[in-house]
Amino acid sequence: MSRSCELTGKGVQSGNNVSHANNKTKRKFLPNLCNVTLISDALGQRFRLRVSAAALRSVEHRGGLDAFLLKADETELSMRARLLRRQIVKKAAEAA
């Protein structure tokens, strides 16, 4: 399991710890990942995803998983999230 968000693609970044004496040592900045269960209204199912805390706030802000995935750029999404997005688009097309 990689250390990256399935919805936003946010991942590990590298940088330096800088001491008071300006000594630099390498370090990693890890994303704040949470295992959450999100509900798709269009599909009527629950999905367990590993997302960052910032992505979770964005999902809530946009009005749920369906709205977030429909508005998201497909290149940033994981393969699993892309599949979910395609299923939601297909279901919406059938309903219309």
UniProtKB/Swiss-Prot annotation:
Q: Where is this region: Disordered?
A: 1-24
Biased composition of type Polar residues is found at: 1-22
The entry's cellular-component GO terms read: cytosolic large ribosomal subunit
| Entry keyword Ribosomal protein | yes
Look up the domain of life of the source: Bacteria
| SUPFAM superfamilies assigned to the protein according to its UniProt record, in alphabetical order | L28p-like
Recorded hits in InterPro entries, A to Z, give:
Ribosomal_bL28, Ribosomal_bL28/bL31-like_sf, Ribosomal_bL28_bact-type, Ribosomal_bL28_sf
Return the Pfam families for the record. Ribosomal_L28
Please provide the record's keywords in A-Z order.
Ribonucleoprotein, Ribosomal protein
Gene Ontology annotations of biological process type: translation
An example Gene Ontology molecular-function term: structural constituent of ribosome
Leader sequence segment: none
| Similarity comment: family membership | Belongs to the bacterial ribosomal protein bL28 family.
Kindly give the NCBIfam families that the UniProt entry links to this protein: L28 (TIGR00009)
- HAMAP family, alphabetically? Ribosomal_bL28 (MF_00373)
This protein is called: Large ribosomal subunit protein bL28
What organism does the record attribute this protein to? Sinorhizobium medicae (strain WSM419)
What lineage does the source organism belong to? Answer: Bacteria, Pseudomonadati, Pseudomonadota, Alphaproteobacteria, Hyphomicrobiales
Gene transcribed to yield this protein: rpmB
